[in-house]
Amino acid sequence: MILYIVLPFYVRTKPYSILPSYSSLQWITNAWCSLPSIYILCHCSKHQEEITILALKPLIAMNNSEEWPLKHVQPPKLSFRHLLSRSVTDAPSLRVRWFYAVDRPLRKSRTGPTEIKKAKNFLPFSAEDSEHIEKSYLKAVENDGQSEPVNVNEDYLYSVNVVSRELSPIYWDGPVYRILRGTWFFSRGDKLYPCEENLATQVEEGYLNSCPYREFSNEKDSAAAQSKTWALLGRYTGGFVQYTGSRNARLVYDDFYRNVSVKIMNRFSPASFHRSDKLVRGYELDMLESNSKPSTPVPTEELTSTTLLNDSSDPSDNFTPSNTESTIDLPSATDASHLMSRPDREVNHLILCCHGIGQKMGERVETVSFVKDISNFRKTLKKTFNSSPDLQAVYPKLKGGGNGVQCLPLLWRQDIRFGMARDLDSSFADDDDDDDESLNMSRDLALDDLEDDSIPTLDNINIPTVTGLRNIISDVLLDVLLYCQPNYRDKILAAVVKRLNRLYNLYKKNVPSFNGHVSLLGHSLGALILFDIIRYQGNIKYSKLQLDFPVANFFALGSPLGLFQMLNGKKIAGPIPKTNLTRSLSYSEQSFDSGVSILSCQNFYNIFHPTDPISYRVEPLVVKQMARLKPQKISHFRPHQDLSSSGVGHKIAGGALNVLSGLRSGIANTLILKSLSYASVFNEATADSHDESQGAENIRDWHIDERMYRLNKTGRIDFMLQEGALDTSYSYVSAMNAHSEYWKNVDLAHFILTQLL
C-alpha cells in the first residue's frame, strides 16, 4: 500500500524534516510509518504539472534537532532544491561559489571532537576549485550522497568532502574546516556576504517558483516586483523575500509581524517597522571586475553552513540575517583573474621537513605548530623568489608560476607514546589501501607488561606533583634523552621512515607528473633523525630504514648533530668515489665501518643562527683543519624594491643573463675563494716546493678539499646566518628566540633557493 499526500507547490521541505507550519502531517506519517513508501506530490497549477518531490521509505515528520527514528532505514540524502531547479528550464544559470572557513575549525584533527563554536571568517575558493567542487556536489546528489574528494587550493594540499562540507589537509593530520556553498549573497556596498545555506535554499526555491526573471527581464515592472514575495519558514519564520529583478531580491524580516500576513505587511506596514537586506543571486564575474579591494575575511557574528547534503541547518546556531557579518571582500581585478584561472605550477623540488623537540606540546599549546612553521616557510620561499630579480632572471620560466619548490611537514612525535599504556590508532590508517602502509603504532614503546619482572613505564615512575612543569619536560627535553637510548631510537627512526615514504608516495599519487628531486630538511632533533636515516641508506643491515627515493640535498637547521657525532667518536664523510685516484686518498674500508658516518646524499648543509644555543658545527668532523676557518656567512638578501629604488635593479635585470648564467656552477668557486683561507697557502706551496716532504703536504691539503666536496658542491658545509643590530647588542635575549626563527628568515629562504634551482 502506498500513501500519496498532495500538497500545494509552494510547500518547501527537506528529507525527513517537515517544516513547522505543516506539523499537522505528523499524525499521518506516524499512523502510516509501516507503509513501504510515502510520496509527496506537489501540484503546480501555474505550470499544470505534478512533480514528485520526495519518495521516502518512510517519511517521518520531525524537527531538525531530532534523530532519524528508524534505525533499519537509511535517511535519504536527495536534495529537494536540486529536483526543483530541474523542473524550471528557463531560469538563468546560477553561478555558484564555494567558500571555506579560516578562523575556527570544525575539529582540531581528523578524529578529534567537533568544536561547538562556529566559524566566522570565510574566503572564496578559486574559480577552478569552486567549479570542481560544484561538479562533485552535483554528482553526489545524483549518486545519493556518494562522492570523491576534491583536491583544492595552492598545489592541492587540501581535500574537500562535499557531503560532510569539510576541508582537511591531505599530507598531515591537521584542523578540519567548514566549507559553504554560496548561491545567494547579501550585497552591502562593494562586499558580498554569502547567505547561510538553509536560507539560500529557501530564497532560491521562491525564485524558481515566482520566476521574476520572466517579468523583469527589462527591469521596468516595479509594481509586479511588490507582488513577487516569498515567505520564509523554519528558523526564518516572520521574514519574507521580495524579488526585485532578474537576479536581485530584498530580504525583509521583523518579529513584530511574525504572525501577520505577508500581503498585509507589504501593503500597510511602514517601512521603518521592519528591516531589509539586498540579495544578489550568484557570484557574478562583473561584480568581481567592478571591485578594487582584495579578498580578505571579515569577522561575523553568526554564520553556519550545512554539514549534510540535504542542506539541513543546525538549530542551535541562532542564525538571523541581521547578524550576518561574514563578509567576503571581493578581490581586485588582478586577483579576480587569478581566481577565475589558476595554472598548475611546476614543482621541480620536493622538500620533506622533519620537526625536532617540543612538538608534543602542540597538543596542549596551539601556538606550537610545525605545520604552521612550514606554512610560513613555504610563504617565505614564494615571497623571496617573487622579489628576487637574480633568481627570476636565471629561471624566467618559473616567474609568475611559483618557485618550483614544494615543502611538506612530517609529523612523527604523535606516533610515539613513551610510557602510555594504551593503543594509538594512526590518523592516517584509513588513507592507505593496505595494512602495511598504515602507521598504526598500537604497541607502546615503554614495553608495558603486566609481569612483575617487566620494565616499568614512564607513568609508573612519574611523581604526580608539579604536573605542568613535568609535562613540559616530558614533551620537550625527554625527546632528546630517549633518542639516545637504542630501543626508543630504533622505534623513532622506523616511524619517521614510514612517514617519509608515505608522504613521497602520496605526493606522487596526487601529482603523477612530478619527476624532480627530493630533499630532506630537519630542524633541531629532526636533523639528527634524518642524518641517521641518510647514513643508513644502501646498507642491507638496515633494510627497514630504506627510503623509496634518493636524497638530493639535506638541510640541517639549528642542529645538535655535530655534538652527538663528537660524543659518539664518529667523523662524517660523503659517498665513496669510484675512481682509483680518489680511492687511494680516501678512508680505509675499516675506518668506514667503525668511526665514520657516510651520508648518501649529493649535498649536506648545516645552517644555523650564531646565537642559536642548540646548533653546532660539523666541518671539523669532516676535516679537523676546518676548525681554523669561520663558518661561511649567508649574505643578506636585498628584495627587488630595495634594488630598484637605487637603480641597481635595472642593471641586474639587464645583465642578469650574462652575469648569473653560471650561478649554479660558479657559486661553489665563489664561496671557496672567499672562505677557504688555506687555498692561497696551497698555491704558494705548489709554486715554491721542490722537495718530497713539501709535495706530501700539498697532497694532504688537496685531500682536505676533496673530502669537503664529497659532501657539498660548494666545498663548505657550515653556513651561518648573519646577526642583526639587535642580535649583536642583546645576544642573550636573541638566543631565546633564535632556535625557532628560521622559518620566516628571507636570507635563509634565498640561500636555499639558490642551492636548489
Curated annotation (Swiss-Prot):
It comes from the Eukaryota. Pfam families: DDHD, DUF7131, WWE_2. One of its GO terms (cellular component) is mitochondrion. Keywords: Hydrolase, Lipid degradation, Lipid metabolism, Mitochondrion, Transit peptide. The active site is at 524. Probable phospholipase that hydrolyzes phosphatidic acid. This is Probable phospholipase C20G8.02, mitochondrial.
